[in-house]
Amino acid sequence: MKGVVFTEFLEMVEQRFSPDMVDDVIDDARLPHGGVYTAVGTYPHGEIVAMVVALSQRAGLPVPDLIRAFGEHLFGRFVQAYPAFFTGVKDAFGFLSGIEDIIHAEVRKLYPDAELPRFIVEYHDADRLVLLYQSPRHFEDLAEGLMHGCVAHYKEPIRITRDTT
């Protein structure tokens, strides 16, 4: 998993909780990399899972809720860090339906070793978008949080539902 995910997670923990909480989470998680990440590095998915579990235990909040909140935070950071991805995109459906062919294609150019999830458009019309999420990491809560962040960014009254079948 790319280091930007790790650095942004730690940034969110610092903003929403405290710098001390970041230190506690890193200590509790007993991470092989010691909590030191670079945005362009690649790290095991298990390390971020360990940090989320440690945060959940410290904060008393459910892991899925924390991961979804992180997804929302991460989308906002992507808007700031990668404005070109949003240029000319008029709405949430336009952005979400272009993740695989536009966003991930560009990410692969920058980071050929990136292990990205897949977002397959199963159905799309003016009122409904059905996306299929595929990833061996099963970070569905993160994907859902990113979608909520997208909807909030475009300020649209879109309801997100999840089918786990």
Give residue ranges: language-model regions:
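Charged, compositionally biased N-terminal leader segments and the immediate start
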Residues: 1-34
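Short, non-transmembrane amphipathic alpha-helical segments
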Residues: 141-156
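Short secondary-structure junctions
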Residues: 110-115, 152-158
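Amphipathic interaction/junction segments at domain boundaries or subunit interfaces
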Residues: 47-140
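Long amphipathic alpha-helical segments
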Residues: 21-58
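Beta-rich nucleic-acid/ligand-interaction surfaces
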Residues: 160-165
